[in-house]
Amino acid sequence: MGQKVHPIGIRLGVVKRHNANWYANPKQYAEYLLKDLQVREFLTKKLKNAMVSNILIERPSGAAKVTISTARPGIVIGKKGEDIEKLQRELTNIMGVPAQVSINEIDRPDLDARLVAEAIASQLEKRVMFRRAMKRAVQNTMRAGAKGIKVEVSGRLGGAEIARTEWYREGRVPLHTLRADIDYATMRAETTYGTIGVKVWIFRGEILGGMKQVMNPAPAEERPAKRGRGRGEGQERRGRRGDRAADKGE
């Protein structure tokens, strides 16, 4: 029976970054890893409604830097930055070194696999039909500019007695192409019938520049303003047509 390798794990160092960037002595490695897990668990619970996608942990000498990627930065920052200052103090207590928190805003949450999986899981918990939730997620992601998406749900779908797996795919999802920018995430929906697993793969295009392009992304180009027919322009055109009709009548 064929199995799929983790789409992000196989691309680490090729077109994907690690979620933790630090070096440690063999004696300190277990301690650092445990604190990283504690930080991620703490932030996941505390920022449950902030649509957090990724947490990057870095350890410069004698300090720590935590970068939170979220679609709702206002919830993390709080009024006048009070919440983020409190968050920094709590992370400092957990990690044992001064911690700095920075926010990375996600402009298009429909292209983020974790946020899409969270949205599907949330709908399943609210008793939305799983096919409708899957189709809605696929449509929104493709409309946002994705090259392809695959969504898979498994469990007691619709309250059935026998668990099964169903999936839906649109566009291309090339899992064997290492330069392909594949975002992957899993989530669990706790329903009254049991746990339903959600998996999402999103293909956002190819990264031809490798890790250099990932570490130093090019600035987004400004979109040209749309030319719409304004009220005055439309009136002017109608006026010209009316003048031509009047000339023919004469």
From Swiss-Prot:
Subunit and interaction comment: Part of the 30S ribosomal subunit. Forms a tight complex with proteins S10 and S14.
Name the UniProt record assigns to this protein: Small ribosomal subunit protein uS3
Keywords for this protein: Ribonucleoprotein, Ribosomal protein, RNA-binding, rRNA-binding
A biological-process GO annotation: translation
Protein function: Binds the lower part of the 30S subunit head. Binds mRNA in the 70S ribosome, positioning it for translation.
Gene3D superfamilies, sorted: 3.30.300.20, Ribosomal protein S3, C-terminal domain (3.30.1140.32)
GO MF terms, alphabetically ordered: mRNA binding; rRNA binding; structural constituent of ribosome
Species assigned in the record: Acinetobacter baumannii (strain ATCC 17978 / DSM 105126 / CIP 53.77 / LMG 1025 / NCDC KC755 / 5377)
Family: Belongs to the universal ribosomal protein uS3 family.
